[in-house]
Amino acid sequence: MSKTLSVDKSQLRSPWSTYWTLTKPKVVALMLLTSVVGMSLAPHEHFTWHQALIALVGIALMAGSAAAFNHLIDRRIDAKMARTYRRPLPKGDVSPFNVLLFALLIGSLGFLSLMLWVNSLTAYLTFASLLGYAVVYTLYLKRATPQNIVIAGIAGAMPPLLGWTSITGELHPHAWLLVMIIFIWTPPHFWALAIHRKEDYAKVNIPMLPVTHGVEYTKTSILLYAILLALVCMLPVLVGMASYLYLFSALVLNVCFVRYAIKLKFRAEERTAIEMFRFSIYFLLLLFCALLLDQQLAL
């Protein structure tokens, strides 16, 4: 009787829910927020809501495609790691071939949307980001060097630039400054998780920094990056992109982030690393929300 009532949850899972999970929707949502900030800060001479919405859909589709490719390429190591063994492919919820078709389909739709109804620059930059994450990072760098996150971080840092170019059709130093913030944020964000999951990464021979250089070295690197991030976050104020609301928010958030890094380095407890990882997500979310609100209040 109990066996009859005990139904595997994976059997009840909708195929749509499975494919939705493959796109890493929470990650994509954060990327879209940073894209919206890029759009908001860009000159608005040629702005239309129609174009902005299509741009966001196109960026989301290609980001989801990159995430699905990541699931596909990493399916064997995901099956061996405690953090990822319940993902759709290791659980058998979907076949690798179907994931490949899904990734190609939504990636193609995203690229065509950007190319036909936004502009070619945004389409090609988004495609380059997809290749950078799905191929260069996931297929090669992740398994090749402990600096994988640093080198490939540019791919995940591109959304503000994509938002900017979707409105203007051109590159601008202010957009690259937003990219720099995410680029510097990425290593301490991922290294905190890597410390918490060090044994997992070691088990599948992924050369994350704590595995190859030790936890203490990684903690020092996180602290240095946190300090550098605090400095970089002040640049939007110095170049006139943001005002006092952003300045206050950035100061508070960076003080908290650096305090986490100091605690991790000198007074770490068992869960300090994972707590810093989780805070880093809220850090980026709140920082870009502050930048967006600051810009809207200045209008």
UniProtKB/Swiss-Prot annotation:
CDD domains registered for this protein in UniProt: PT_UbiA_Cox10
UniProt keyword list: Cell inner membrane, Cell membrane, Heme biosynthesis, Membrane, Transferase, Transmembrane, Transmembrane helix
Database matches in Gene3D superfamilies: UbiA prenyltransferase
EC number: 2.5.1.141
Ranges annotated as spanning the membrane: 27-47, 53-73, 97-117, 121-141, 149-169, 175-195, 222-242, 244-264, 273-293
Membrane topology of the entry: Multi-pass membrane protein
Lipid metabolism keyword on record: no
GO terms under biological process: heme O biosynthetic process
GO MF: protoheme IX farnesyltransferase activity
Function of the protein: Converts heme B (protoheme IX) to heme O by substitution of the vinyl group on carbon 2 of heme B porphyrin ring with a hydroxyethyl farnesyl side group.
Protein name stated in the entry: Protoheme IX farnesyltransferase
Provenance organism: Vibrio vulnificus (strain YJ016)
Gene symbol of the encoding locus: cyoE
